[in-house]
A protein has these predicted regions:
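Surface-exposed, low-hydrophobicity beta-strand/loop segments enriched in small/polar/acidic residues
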Residues: 1-112
């Protein structure tokens, strides 16, 4: 049996362009755009698309993210941006619900 969390509780917003790329975790930059996170930054969501000077960012719901470093634990885990568009365990981050981890692809499904 396959389980999918895709689209559950998704809230997607549009921001002016920024420095973030599709699939990366992002933050709201100084100019109000979807900007790439530095290592240790708290992230607001995941960029789904960017074109025409605007960025579409998922800020709530279940979403797949890449991770680096240690595999995130299932359940509530403190995560922050790793500076490459992925997430990593980091005590200075925020707590997210991790429901699935793929160690081969180094991805996790989290609830924003």
């Amino acid at each position: 049996m396959n389980i999918s969390y895709e689209g559950i509780g998704a809230l997607v917003v549009t921001f002016p362009g920024g420095t973030c790329r599709t699939g990366q975790v992002c933050k709201i930059g100084i100019a109000g755009g979807a900007d790439k996170c530095s290592s240790g930054d708290k992230f607001c969501g995941v960029m789904l698309a960017g074109e025409g000077g605007v960025s579409t960012v998922q800020v709530e719901g279940f979403v797949q993210v890449g991770y680096s470093g240690t595999k995130p634990s299932l359940g509530y885990t403190v995560l922050a941006a790793d500076g490459t568009g992925k997430v990593a365990a980091n005590a200075n981050g925020r707590e997210y619900l991790v429901v699935e981890v793929d160690t081969e692809e180094m991805t996790a499904i989290i609830k924003l």
